From Swiss-Prot:
Keywords: ATP-binding, Calcium, Kinase, Metal-binding, Nucleotide-binding, Phosphoprotein, Repeat, Sensory transduction, Serine/threonine-protein kinase, Transferase, Vision, Zinc, Zinc-finger. Belongs to the protein kinase superfamily. AGC Ser/Thr protein kinase family. PKC subfamily. The lineage of its organism: Eukaryota, Metazoa, Ecdysozoa, Arthropoda, Hexapoda. One of its GO terms (biological process) is response to ethanol. Residues 189-310 form the C2 domain. This is Protein kinase C, eye isozyme. The gene is inaC. ATP binds at I377, G378, K379, G380, S381, F382, G383, K384, V385, K400. Residues 630-700 form the AGC-kinase C-terminal domain. Exclusively expressed in photoreceptor cells. The keyword Glycosyltransferase does not apply.
Amino acid sequence: MAAAAVATPGATVLPPSVPSAAPGAKAPAAGAGKGPGNLLEITGEANIVNYMKNRLRKGAMKRKGLEMVNGHRFGVRFFKNPTYCGHCKDFIWGFGKQGFQCEECRFNIHQKCCKFVVFKCPGKDTDFDADCAKVKHGWISTTYTTPTFCDECGLLLHGVAHQGVKCENCNLNVHHACQETVPPMCGADISEVRGKLLLYVELKGNNLKVDIKEAANLIPMDTNGFSDPYIAVQMHPDRSGRTKKKTKTIQKNLNPVFNETFTFELQPQDRDKRLLIEVWDWDRTSRNDFMGSFSFSLEELQKEPVDGWYKFLSQVEGEHYNIPCVDAFNDIARLRDEVRHDRRPNEKRRMDNKDMPHNMSKRDMIRAADFNFVKVIGKGSFGKVLLAERRGTDELYAVKVLRKDVIIQTDDMELPMNEKKILALSGRPPFLVSMHSCFQTMDRLFFVMEYCKGGDLMYHMQQYGRFKESVAIFYAVEVAIALFFLHERDIIYRDLKLDNILLDGEGHVKLVDFGLSKEGVTERQTTRTFCGTPNYMAPEIVSYDPYSIAADWWSFGVLLFEFMAGQAPFEGDDETTVFRNIKDKKAVFPKHFSVEAMDIITSFLTKKPNNRLGAGRYARQEITTHPFFRNVDWDKAEACEMEPPIKPMIKHRKDISNFDDAFTKEKTDLTPTDKLFMMNLDQNDFIGFSFMNPEFITII
C-alpha cells in the first residue's frame, strides 16, 4: 500500500496554476492554496511526480489479517465472552485477539486450528451443485437445563427456555440464529481433536511395511504451547514389547515431519492382531503422555495398502478402529459424479492428447520449448509474465505463466478458464490484448499474447505525475470502448487499474489480465464475490452487497480522477481506511479540474450503483454523449484513428525500458513446484484449456 493518508479537514488542495508535469520536471509543492479536501497533503519538496514514483503496485484481493480456508474468510477476533473452538472443542483462551471468526458464517476457531477446517463455508456461494452434497440436519427447538455451548459459534446458549436447537440425528447444539450457517453435513465427523497422521502401510506376504511421513494439528501438551511428539508402532496386543518400534522425537512441534520407515516380519501368531499407531509426548523428568492412536486389522491391509491422512483417536477407540480424513463435501460430490458417469456408459471422455488444442493438429501444437524467455515484464499472485521470442522466428510475445498447484490450492480453477474464454472472443476491438494461443504442461498453464512494447500506464504515470485533460480523455475513450465490448457480452471486468492498461508500440491502449472477469453479469444480473484492487473497488463490493457491471464504471471514475490528479480519490494507510473512505467520503477535486471533468467523475463515483453513470441499459449512449467527451469522434476512436498523445520510446526490438525495474531485474527461471503434489494432481481439471487463436494467426 502506498504511503498515503487521508487529509484532515483543512488540508491543502492543488492550486489551479499547477500544470501537468513533464517527464523529469518538478511540480510545485502543494500548499499554495487552501480549502477543504480529501486529497493527500503534499508539503515541502514533495510533488506529484515523486508521489507517483514512490507509489507501490497493489495486487488484487490482497486482504491483511485474513485466512482463506475452504471459502471461509477467517479474521482475527477478540472474544469478550467465554468461547469454545468449533474445531477442537477446546476453550479459546488468551489475552487480546485470541482466535479467528469467519466473516461469512461466524464460525469461531483457534488460530492454530484454522487451516484444518475441512468443510466449505455455508455462507459462501459454491460453484458445484450444492444440493447433491447436502445432508441436512433435523433441528428441534430444545430447552437446556445445564449450561450448554453452541457447536457453531462456541458461545453459551443463554436464556431460560428454548435457548437453541438440537439435531435429532447427530446431537449438534446451536443457537437459533446459528442454524442457518451450520454446514449441511449431518453425521459427518469434520473435526480433528487430537490431530492427524500421514502414512503409507503395505502388507505383502509376511512383510509389513509402514512409512510414517508427517503429523499435523497435534494437541499441545507442554506449558510452552507445544509438544515433543514421537510415533510408536507395534502389533497389538503385544505384552512383551517384541514388535514395538519408535520414531525419533521432534521437539517443540505440533506439525512434525518424521519420514521414517519400519518393517515387520509377521509370525503366524500375529495374524489376529492389529497394527497400532500411537503418538506420545516425550518428557524428560516424568512419564510420557499419550496423545492419540488408531489401528488397522491385518485383514484390511491384505485387501489394499493404506495411503493418506488418519485421525488420532482416544486410547480405547484407537485400539479398535481408524477414521480416515476426508473432505466430506468433495467426497459426496465425487460419489455424485461417479453416479452421473455410470448413467452415461456410452459417453467416452476425450482423454488422449488432452494438452492439444481442439482446433489444431498435433504437429502444430505450441510448446514451452518453442520459446526463448528473455525477461520478466510482469508478476502476479499466480505467476509471472515473460517476454518470449519464438525459436526460429523474429516473433515476440508476452507469455503469462500460471502455476497449477497455486490455482488448485486456492480453488481458483475458474479464473484461467474464464480468462482464456474472454481472450478467445471474436470481433474484439483493438483495445483488448490479443491472444496467440494457450497451452499447458504438467505443472503450468501458458497464455501466449501479443507483446505490448509501451509498458503499462502505471509506469507512464510515474514519469509524468499526472496527465492533461486532453491526454486523460484519449485514454478514457479507448478504455471505455473496451468496457463497452465486455459489458455488451455480459462480462464484468472487476480489475480496472493503471497496472492493467498497457500501451502498444504506437501508444494505443491494450486492456489485459481478465483473471477476475466473470460472465453472466449485467445491469440486472448480479454477483457477490469480494475481489478487485482496494483503491478501485466500488462501495457495493466493499460492503459485500450484490453488484453488477456498474462496479466497473466506479473503477473507471477512479481511473479518470487518477489520470488528472495524479492520485486516487480515496486513499488510506491500510485497506480498512481505504474501504471506509470509499463508503463514507466524497471525492474532492483539485482546482484545475474542468466543470465537465468534475461532473462526469461525480456521476461515475455515485455511491448508489443504480444511480451511477453507466448503470442502465443505455450506458454507451449516456457516456459517449457526456459533455466531457464533446470533442471525441467515437467512430474514429473505435477504428484506432485517433493520434496517441504519448508514443513510447522504443530503442530496439527487445527494448524493455518501458517496464518496471522491479520486474525486469528478476530471473526468468520458473519457480519449482511440489513434485509430490503434482503427481497427485488431477490433470482432467485442465482439459480444454489449450487453444490456438485463428484470428491471431491470420494477422501474423
